[in-house]
Design a protein with these regions (language model features):
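Short acidic, hydrophobic short linear motifs in intrinsically disordered regions
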Residues: 20-29
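Short beta-strand "wing" residues that participate in macromolecule-binding interfaces
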Residues: 55
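Short, cationic-aromatic polyanion-contact patches
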Residues: 3-6, 58-76
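Pre-recognition alpha-helix immediately N-terminal to the DNA-recognition helix
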Residues: 8-13, 24, 92
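Short helix-capping/hinge SLiMs at alpha-helix to coil transitions
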Residues: 14-18, 31-32
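Glycine-centered, phosphate/nucleic-acid-interacting loop/turn motifs that mediate DNA/RNA or nucleotide
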Residues: 51
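Short, hydrophobic-biased segments on the C-terminal half of alpha helices
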Residues: 41-45
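Amphipathic alpha-helical dimerization/coiled-coil segments
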Residues: 76-119
Length: 120
C-alpha cells in the first residue's frame, strides 16, 4: 500500500495517539501544515479507502485508528528507498551518508554497535 507524504502526516498523528476524531486530527495536523478542514478530511477519506485506518462510530462522530503498524510502514518505506536508489543494498546508503561528514560520532558509534551485534 502506498501512503503519500501528506497521508503519512495523518498516520503519524494516529500512531502517536489513537483513536482520534476528525476534529482532533484537524487540530493536530491542520494548523502546522496550513491545511484546511476539507484537506484533512480528504486525507482521512483516502486512508479509509486504502484500509490504512478504520473508523468506528461514536455517537454522531467517528473515531479513527490506524490499521497499519508504524513499524511495518517504516520497514516498507525503507525497503522501497533502498530498492529505488541503492539496488536494495544497505552499504551504499551508509556510504552515501558517510560522504561529506553527514554522520555524527553518535551515528558512527550506533553503526559500529549494530555491526558488532550482527556479527555475533
Amino acid at each position: 500500500m502506498k501512503i503519500s507524504t501528506a497521508e503519512s502526516v495523518v498516520m503519524e498523528a494516529l500512531w502517536r495517539n489513537s483513536p482520534l476524531t476528525s476534529e482532533a486530527i484537524i487540530a493536530e495536523v491542520g494548523g502546522p501544515n496550513d491545511w484546511t478542514e476539507g484537506t484533512v478530511k480528504v486525507l482521512i477519506s483516502r486512508l479509509l479507502k486504502k484500509k490504512a485506518i478504520a473508523a468506528q462510530a461514536d455517537g454522531r462522530r467517528y473515531l479513527y485508528t490506524p490499521l497499519v503498524a508504524r513499524q511495518a510502514y517504516v520497514r516498507s518505506e525503507s525497503q522501497g528507498l533502498l530498492d529505488r536508489l541503492f539496488n536494495g543494498r544497505l552499504a551504499p546508503l551508509v556510504t552515501h551518508f558517510s560522504d561529506g561528514d553527514q554522520l555524527s560520532d553518535e551515528d558512527i558509534a550506533a553503526l559500529k554497535a549494530l555491526i558488532e551485534k550482527i556479527g555475533r
